[in-house]
From Swiss-Prot:
Keyword Hydrolase: no
Residue ranges, Virion surface side: 31-355
Protein name: Envelope glycoprotein D
Keyword terms, alphabetized: Disulfide bond, Glycoprotein, Host-virus interaction, Membrane, Signal, Transmembrane, Transmembrane helix, Viral attachment to host cell, Viral attachment to host entry receptor, Viral envelope protein, Virion, Virus entry into host cell
Pfam families noted in UniProt: Herpes_glycop_D
Length: 402
């Protein structure tokens, strides 16, 4: 009997251990359970004042979410690179946009605007909304998101204690993200129907961080396909949770939890490094596209003239425009012999030589002329019987003897 009782007690203890283990696993990790209740025990000493006073209206959450997938391949999407250098690091997804120019345009028209800011985690076949908020009755003379009304601030539940908006509400701060948080994030800002896309390629080290929460962004209940977005079936209210804390208060909590877990706060958050996305080959502005554009700008031919050449499709330049023909190669490769350039010293020497030669010829001509004339005079004197002699020589006079 005692043996049976011991066996029953052992089974009971084992069953209790299994139950406790199941509860712990259902919470995820001990750190998750700790983080879920610690807010009741510890609080930050003070919170910053609200950035702007606004009213939350739930009805704005009833609008279907537009697709984050871009069908227009020509559309320019800003791509940023964010890399964590070590585990358990706090990183920021920050990128400037041309929102200011849009707001100035709206301010010039003296009209308010509505906006929507949504963050997505892009997966291979679907996209998961992780943060969504709508803004209404916005004054374009103020900074973005300073609006009189807004929707509930919706977050993916597992990100509430590890993510928050930056001070301008355009960036995203991740505290100690796990390796599973690596990948592509897309920020979509919609202002009066105009959409601004920004991609962030995030890399997290594979080393385990003890305070990080693993994420399952591929959950089919939240990760929606392009077809679901196109049919207007995605409503973030159905699978995202409310967290209507003002931005400053949420960021204060995030930093408090991060330091409480042993993290080191960065001194400052910097804008993510930009990456030049390559142009798709089908849209490369090559020779044929320029020729096509010129053809499109031509006027219609007059009656009796041949039809113009049809427009060329956008494509890479053909090989004949990239490499010369064989005869052109021969012409280019064939060496061209040019006479050597004459230096300045050689030109001077030649000039002097020519001058001396001319002077010599003139001198010889003068000598010949004098000699011929003297010879002619002597010959004339001989014919007259007179010989001309010098009459003086060193002040001594001589007289011709008989």
């Amino acid at each position: 009997m005692s043996t049976f009782k011991l066996m029953m007690d052992g089974r009971l203890v084992f069953a209790m251990a299994i139950a406790i283990l199941s509860v712990v696993l259902s919470c995820g990790t001990c750190e998750k359970a700790k983080r879920a209740v610690r807010g009741r025990q510890d609080r930050p000493k003070e919170f910053p004042p609200p950035r702007y006073n606004y009213t939350i209206l739930t009805r704005y959450n009833a609008t279907a979410l537009a697709s984050p997938f871009i069908n227009d391949q020509v559309k320019n999407v800003d791509l940023r690179i964010v890399t964590a250098t070590r585990p358990c690091e706090m990183i920021a997804l920050i990128a400037k946009t041309n929102i200011d120019s849009i707001l100035k345009e709206l301010a010039a028209a003296q009209k308010t605007y509505s906006a929507r800011l949504t963050w997505f985690k892009i997966m291979p076949t679907c996209a998961t909304p992780i943060h969504d908020v709508s803004y209404m009755k916005c004054n374009p003379k103020l900074s973005f998101a300073m609006c009189d009304e807004r929707s509930d601030i919706l977050w993916q539940a597992s990100l509430i204690t590890m993510a928050a908006e930056t001070d301008d509400e355009l960036g995203l701060v991740l505290a100690a993200p796990a390796h599973s948080a690596s990948g592509l994030y897309r920020r979509v800002i919609e202002i009066d129907g105009r959409q601004i896309y920004t991609d962030f390629s995030v890399t997290i080290p594979s080393e385990r961080c003890p305070i990080a929460f693993e994420q399952n962004f591929g959950n089919p209940d939240r990760c929606k396909t392009p077809e679901q977005y196109s049919r207007g079936e995605v409503f973030t209210r159905r699978f995202l949770g409310e967290f209507n804390f003002p931005q400053g208060e949420h960021m204060t909590w995030l930093k408090f939890w991060f330091v409480y877990d042993g993290g080191n706060l960065p001194v400052q958050f910097y804008e993510a490094q930009a990456f030049a996305r390559p142009v798709p080959p089908d849209n490369h502005p090559g020779f044929d596209s320029v020729e096509s554009e010129i053809t499109q700008n031509k006027t219609d031919p007059k009656p009796g003239q041949a039809d113009p050449k049809p427009n060329q499709p956008f494509k890479w330049p053909s090989i004949k425009h990239l490499a010369p023909r064989l005869d052109e190669v021969d012409e280019v490769i064939e060496p061209v012999t040019k006479p050597p350039k004459t230096s300045k010293s050689n030109s001077t020497f030649v000039g002097i030589s020519v001058g001396l030669g001319i002077a010599g010829l003139v001198l010889v001509g003068v000598i010949l002329y004098v000699c011929l004339r003297r010879k002619k005079e002597l010959k004339k004197s001989a014919q007259n019987g007179l010989t001309r002699l010098r009459s003086t020589f060193k002040d001594v006079k001589y007289t011709q003897l008989p």
